[in-house]
Design a protein with these regions (language model features):
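Outer-membrane beta-barrel strand-turn architecture
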Residues: 8, 57-61, 95-99, 144-146, ...
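Outer-membrane beta-barrel translocator domains and adjoining extracellular loop/strand segments
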Residues: 27-35, 77-83, 114-121, 162-167
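Transmembrane beta-strands of outer-membrane beta-barrel pores
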Residues: 20-26, 71-75, 83, 97-99, ...
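Predominantly the C-terminal beta-signal and adjacent terminal strand-loop region
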Residues: 27-30, 124-128, 136-138, 143-186
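Short glycine/proline- and aromatic-enriched beta-strand/turn motifs that initiate or cap beta-hairpins
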Residues: 10-53, 111, 120, 183-186
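Hydrophobic, lipid-facing positions within transmembrane beta-strands of outer-membrane proteins
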Residues: 47-53, 87-91, 100, 134-138, ...
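Membrane-embedded beta-strand positions of outer-membrane beta-barrel proteins
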Residues: 16-18, 67-69, 91, 104, ...
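Repeated loop/turn-to-beta-strand initiation elements of outer-membrane beta-barrel proteins
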Residues: 12-14, 62-65, 99-102, 146-152
């Protein structure tokens, strides 16, 4: 039993990864809810970044579980720009095809901080944004060797990040992000 546990533990890999992304925060907000903001913003994207740690647990020869702890920043787009500082915990299942690893999973996020960029438009503040987010994750990873890899991930937020406003129940803010990065296993 001890030998089996030691063998299974030796196959678990730890690592770091970081990268940049395109934030496609989806937003629809009425003008009278937040002074100066458009009902729908048309700007296509904003930039974001991420970095964190991961653990990779083999479930079989080809199937792996991927658990991560990541800091990300997401910016809302359009007038009244706001940056959401997030701690994401994604969990994905990866399948190894000769170093190419498609993955699918989900994530939960805690949003401890919101940075408002004051200009002539009002930005969202901490009280306007929910503290938690969740959603689906799709990705693809290419491994150059056993240690170094590149990755791309798409986060599809399912939670409405705006706090409730009884006047505008149809207002919403959702996470939509594409990240591209580099990772290293120890």
């Amino acid at each position: 039993m001890i030998a089996f546990t030691a063998t299974a533990t030796a196959q678990v890999k730890f690592g770091i990864h970081a990268g940049t992304g395109i934030g496609l925060m989806s937003k629809d907000v009425h003008d009278d809810r937040y002074e100066g903001q458009n009902k729908t913003d048309k700007e296509p994207f904003s930039t974001s970044s991420y970095g964190g740690f991961f653990v990779e647990i083999p479930a079989s020869e080809k199937l792996l579980l991927d658990l991560r702890a990541i800091y990300t920043n997401h910016s809302t787009i359009g007038k009244g720009k706001t940056m959401l500082h997030r701690i994401d915990v994604p969990l994905a299942i990866k399948y190894d095809i000769s170093g190419l690893r498609p993955k699918v999973g989900g994530y939960v996020s805690y949003i401890p901080e919101v940075t408002s960029f004051e200009d002539k438009y009002r930005s969202f503040t901490r009280k306007d944004i929910e503290k938690f987010d969740y959603g689906a994750l799709l990705g693809l990873e290419y491994n150059f060797n056993e240690k170094l890899f590149i990755e791309t991930n798409f986060y599809l937020g399912l939670a409405n990040l705006l706090t409730k406003d009884p006047r505008h129940s149809s207002d919403y803010l959702h996470t939509r992000s594409i990240f591209v990065g580099l990772g290293y296993r120890f």
